[in-house]
A protein has these predicted regions:
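Structural signature for solvent-exposed beta-strand/loop edge elements and short helix-capping sites
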Residues: 1-158
Length: 158
């Protein structure tokens, strides 16, 4: 994708030109230009849909992201090229799981981001990028938000 400066590769993929979509499995990795740097997205499955200027990239299961000053994990990811919204999501917990898991166990499934000495977590994390510069403008954490940072004396939570 030369318009959005995105690349997706993996060991197996299928392209559906009529539907403007592609699916990549078996070690898929997507590379997206963000902040004049590369954001690497790895997942069990990557799905790209829509024309280049409106492309949506969705990653399922075991998502890992990495950029020079930011890294993270989540169950799934949704990247909207047009709006610049990157969502790190937790797979919804079913009724049976909610009965078996403690609140602490459910929180451990939340997406997590690390930047420098800061760890951020919550049920849903939004990274908003400027659609013209691809710079990360803001970060929002929804529900059960935790931001922890370790200083030189002792750890503290914000």
């Amino acid at each position: 994708d030369t318009i959005g400066n995105n690349v997706i590769r993996g060991e197996y993929g299928e392209v559906f030109k009529d539907k403007d979509s592609a699916i990549v499995t078996q070690n898929p990795i997507a590379v997206k230009l963000v902040d004049k740097d590369s954001l690497y997205i790895h997942a069990d499955t990557l799905l790209a849909t829509g024309p280049a200027e409106n492309r949506i990239l969705t990653g399922y299961y075991g998502v890992r992201i990495y950029k020079t000053n930011l890294s993270g994990v989540s169950d799934s990811i949704h990247v909207d090229q047009k709006s610049g919204l990157i969502q790190l999501l937790r797979y919804p917990i079913g009724d049976r799981e909610s009965q078996l898991l403690s609140a602490s166990d459910m929180t451990k499934r939340n997406p997590v981001l690390w930047s420098a000495k800061t760890q951020m977590s919550g049920d849903l994390i939004h990274l908003l990028t400027d659609s013209t510069t691809n710079a990360i403008d803001s970060l929002k954490i929804f529900n059960n938000a935790v931001v922890a940072e370790q200083d030189s004396l002792n750890p503290h939570s914000i």
